[in-house]
């Protein structure tokens, strides 16, 4: 999905539909403006207050800057907004994985725990002018997979073999000493 042509203002950049209307911004991606309210409408009042505390001031700043932005500046702004959200998500995941690891360490469970950190696929972060994950290029095939398995995986080791998440269940069953059903896929 192309940064310039397909990234939508409301969904990807968190611009409120009323701000888009006020500025006369058509949503070129065809995204339903009502979808924004359906999404944030699922938030409870405390969550919505947090959402508005973060994105409200950003929307106000955007309203002031938008009329004087060039097309290139608009694209750069959208990209930065998208990346800030993405990196904020990464930071939150990192902090919470750290909390889980701290708990395991504090409760002497690290030596008896297999830790797997992965994702569903790779992601475009501006490469080829794209965002998201929908095209068959190298970036979308690079799925992160980190494993800590005491006594099985040496710390700092790297394996270049192809792995599929289809194999995870088989691996965990084998580690637990449980035979896999004969009709189960994976290795």
Regions found by a protein language model. Name each.
Residues 165, 169:
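Zinc-coordinating Cys/His ligand positions in small cysteine/histidine-rich zinc-finger domains
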Residues 1-162, 175-183:
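Active-site-proximal cap/lid insertion segments
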Residues 187:
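FAD-dinucleotide binding site
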